[in-house]
């Protein structure tokens, strides 16, 4: 055998070994170094307006002019016409919305307003938070944004105990606000349909409960302070759908593709904060039928069938934001 042939065989053997090792590692571990930065005990420097500059590249400069939360004065004294129905606008739902805005608030707390530079983390519900030991790190951020019914009690070591903002919708409100939130947590309603306004009104005003019009029965009793409730401006759902996912805003009623609460929360953070980090985002591969998707329950991707969410498309959007430095990742993606 010539020396040239000998080296070719050695090279081929080496390639085979590398391939075997590569595929013996789980996909998540394989990409653990991508779009991930090691967590430091020191706070990362925060530069005022940095997230705004990054957001303008994605959403355009005009998006910062929009209020984060809906206000009564914009619907009571001056009619604010909306071009779209929920979840991308308020067209056709104004009367119900007025009643809700009359008993809730819209202000951003002084504890956030007064910050020279707002350091925020959006905590996803992903399985990769399990055994992450990120709780202490998460608690150090000025603003901690959580999603839906993701629990804190019993998981503090991995997800922290601080909750500044929690986004929810009626069907995801199956959590005890007294246990899973802090006393000053803002509960921000993401309205997908007019019945969502009706539900929150009946809860806060103790009226006859609504039982129909939901894909899952929401709580009939929910002990919350109306002054802690905010209504998210559906503008943020619109730009997340349009600018991040390229979804049509005018859709047939039976289709209704829409962003997940997680992607919506990142969009919100880029408009509220100066520094935005994320943790616990990402789903298993589509072929992985057994991997759980949340850190707190045993459900798989199968549970998202028919949800109107395209998680593959959202992964591309989040990867794009990570690549351009608009957000940084505490876990891996």
From Swiss-Prot:
Pathway per the UniProt entry: Protein modification; protein glycosylation; Glycolipid biosynthesis
Keywords: Disulfide bond, Glycoprotein, Glycosyltransferase, Golgi apparatus, Lipid metabolism, Membrane, Signal-anchor, Transferase, Transmembrane, Transmembrane helix
Membrane topology listed for this record: Single-pass type II membrane protein
Lumenal topological domain residue ranges: 27-333
Catalyzed reactions: a beta-D-galactosyl-(1->3)-N-acetyl-beta-D-galactosaminyl derivative + CMP-N-acetyl-beta-neuraminate = an N-acetyl-alpha-neuraminyl-(2->3)-beta-D-galactosyl-(1->3)-N-acetyl-beta-D-galactosaminyl derivative + CMP + H(+); a beta-D-galactosyl-(1->3)-N-acetyl-alpha-D-galactosaminyl derivative + CMP-N-acetyl-beta-neuraminate = an N-acetyl-alpha-neuraminyl-(2->3)-beta-D-galactosyl-(1->3)-N-acetyl-alpha-D-galactosaminyl derivative + CMP + H(+); a beta-D-galactosyl-(1->4)-N-acetyl-beta-D-glucosaminyl derivative + CMP-N-acetyl-beta-neuraminate = an N-acetyl-alpha-neuraminyl-(2->3)-beta-D-galactosyl-(1->4)-N-acetyl-beta-D-glucosaminyl derivative + CMP + H(+); a ganglioside GM1 (d18:1(4E)) + CMP-N-acetyl-beta-neuraminate = a ganglioside GD1a (d18:1(4E)) + CMP + H(+)
Pfam family, any one: Glyco_transf_29
Major site of localization recorded for this protein: Golgi
Cell compartments where the protein resides: Golgi apparatus, Golgi stack membrane
Transmembrane feature ranges: 9-26
InterPro entries cross-referenced by the UniProt entry: Glyco_trans_29, Glycosyltransferase_29, GT29-like_sf, Sialyl_trans
GO molecular function, a single term: beta-galactoside (CMP) alpha-2,3-sialyltransferase activity
Glycosylation sites (chain numbering): 61, 131, 310, 329
Membrane topology (Cytoplasmic): 1-8
Annotated GO CC locations: Golgi cisterna membrane
Gene3D superfamilies xref list: Glycosyl transferase family 29
EC number: 2.4.3.2, 2.4.3.4, 2.4.3.6
One of the GO BP terms on file: lipid glycosylation
Bridged cysteine pairs (disulfide): 120-273
Domain of life assignment: Eukaryota
Function noted in UniProt: A beta-galactoside alpha2-3 sialyltransferase involved in terminal sialylation of glycoproteins and glycolipids. Catalyzes the transfer of sialic acid (N-acetyl-neuraminic acid; Neu5Ac) from the nucleotide sugar donor CMP-Neu5Ac onto acceptor Galbeta-(1->3)-GalNAc- and Galbeta-(1->4)-GlcNAc-terminated glycoconjugates through an alpha2-3 linkage. Plays a major role in hemostasis. Responsible for sialylation of plasma VWF/von Willebrand factor, preventing its recognition by asialoglycoprotein receptors (ASGPR) and subsequent clearance. Regulates ASGPR-mediated clearance of platelets.
Family that this chain belongs to: Belongs to the glycosyltransferase 29 family.
Name of the protein in its database record: CMP-N-acetylneuraminate-beta-galactosamide-alpha-2,3-sialyltransferase 4
Organism of provenance: Rattus norvegicus (Rat)
